[in-house]
Design a protein with these regions (language model features):
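Leucine-rich repeat
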Residues: 1-311
Length: 311
């Protein structure tokens, strides 16, 4: 949305006049979005808002809060955004859901959150009981908010304190999902913790798993390597009969990459249709690269499907 304000107003008025509108997709290009009157819309089933704009919380979240409350059939919500003007522009999942009647919760099946404060409690949990797909990236944790408080003026610090109460750590989110027995079929995340592995080890039936920038919190390589071994040896086999997509993109070579330590576990995943994984260069004999590639590919060539491989 980089059009002049008058054009944005015309577009929003036109959208509001479409009674059968169910799927809304908006890409913010960095320009002001004060004319984005999401509160004018109702009864949507899918909402996707990507990109960024100044005053995101004021111009987007406030209207989105009303739109969600007026869309009881909403099943798909994608509200990832890439940047914010300042720390006060942080938004929370509570800010989206607290207008929805508790006795008539949403039936969300697909949720994408990027750069949000997330806390799963009596306000937010009812709306994700039926969730099947979750993408959780750049989760804003309480300590990130706290680190800004000391440097801010008292009024700003008080605002940040209120925001922090709607944040929880990534580990707390996965622990709550496990305790509430919410069994996701599709997961995409960028932080791997013991709590995450405990969650996906608590059930079977995962179909799509994407792990990006796979590393441990605090950039502890040793811890990350231990988590990788646990994932391949103990967790992945739990979903070997259901997994169709596995995408693992670590930030450095190590145990998350393909090698002799995880080949057996990967070969158990007989329903894989899409596999993307890095290969440890230290395990490749340069003069025999073609032999190494064949050794990686051969177990997958005999699967019932013809999987897409990205190595």
């Amino acid at each position: 949305m980089n059009d002049p304000e008058w054009a944005q107003i015309v577009v929003m008025d036109s959208l509001a006049s479409l009674p059968a509108l169910e799927d809304l997709r908006i890409s913010l290009g960095g320009a002001p979005a004060s004319s984005l009157k999401l509160e004018l819309l109702t009864n949507l089933r899918k909402i996707t808002i990507s990109g960024y704009c100044p005053n995101y919380k004021q111009d987007v979240v406030s209207g989105l809060h009303t739109l969600i409350a007026n869309s009881p059939r909403l099943t798909y919500l994608d509200v990832g955004y890439n940047t914010r003007a300042n720390v006060l522009d942080v938004s929370s999942l509570h800010g989206l859901f607290n207008g929805v009647p508790r006795d008539i919760p949403l039936d969300l099946r697909h949720l994408v959150l990027r750069n949000w404060c997330v806390r799963l409690d009596e306000i937010t949990l009812p709306h994700i009981r039926l969730l099947e797909s979750l993408s959780l990236h750049l989760n804003i944790e309480p300590q990130q908010i706290a680190s800004h408080q000391a440097a801010e003026e008292p009024e700003t610090s008080h605002t940040l304190s209120r925001t922090a109460q709607y944040c929880s750590t990534t580990s707390e989110i996965w622990t709550t999902l496990r305790e509430e027995r919410i069994k996701l079929k599709e997961i995409s995340t960028d932080e791997i913790t013991p709590a995450f592995l405990e969650y996906i080890a608590s059930y079977s039936g995962l179909e799509k798993l994407t792990l990006t920038f796979t590393t441990a919190r605090e950039d502890d390589v040793y811890t990350s390597e231990k988590l990788a071994l646990k994932f391949y040896n103990e967790v992945l086999p739990m979903h070997a009969q259901s997994l169709t997509t596995l995408d693992i993109c670590p930030i450095y070579e190590g145990k998350w990459c393909f090698g002799s330590h995880n080949a057996a576990s990967l070969h158990l995943c007989t329903k894989l249709q899409n596999l993307r994984i890095h290969i440890n260069s230290e395990e490749i004999d340069r003069p025999k690269k073609d032999v190494v590639v064949r050794s990686v590919l051969s177990p997958f060539l005999f699967l019932p499907f013809s999987p897409y491989l990205f190595l």
